[in-house]
Amino acid sequence: MAFDGVVIANIVYDMNRLLTGGRIYKIYQPEADELLLVVKNNKETYRLLISAGASLPLIYFTTKTKANPMTAPNFCMLLRKYISNGRIIEITQPGMERIVEITIEHLNELGDTCRKKMVIEIMGKHSNIIFIDEKNMIIDSIKHISNQVSSVREVLPGRTYIAPPGKGKISLNDLSVEWMENTLLVKPVSVQKAVYGSISGISPVLANE
């Protein structure tokens, strides 16, 4: 299955249905690029696995358990500090991009209510899990990307979070008959290539279907 924007939209729908309003009970980091969130909601317990692996980035519910390191990695410890027992407020997908944003409400050291956001970018070798504050500042990420690695954007603690650059495609949510007649159907390529090249969230596999 191609992990495109359409597939992610369905996953986000299920995540909202099952997790919104729930409490983050446990946070694990079984692999260097992988998180497991255990969420309790409506008397049920859900296990959400998030992988930012370069070869197979995924986000899905699981019933399986994995061995965890004896000492939790720094990113895992930081998440536990901020959002253990935090409440999931909403889960969104910007446009039809391969991005999932989980908004979490928690109490700070003074007992004040704060919100943080976990941004999950499912983008092949560029996949990442980024933790940001209410001002869109990066607190930390599971992968640090310096300007020596990427000239497009840095992903480092203290930097402002900037979403991955778009490709100028239209969202599925914004399609119209007029746009299709004036843009899609006049392109000098196959319908499959026109769909994939013009509409965000569509993979080549889905465009072919």
Where are these regions (language model features)?
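Short N-terminal secondary-structure initiator segments
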Residues: M1-V6, S151-V155
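A structured, charge-rich N-terminal accessory region that forms the first stable segment of a protein
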Residues: F3-A67, T71
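Phosphate/anion-contacting hairpin/loop surfaces
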Residues: N42-E209
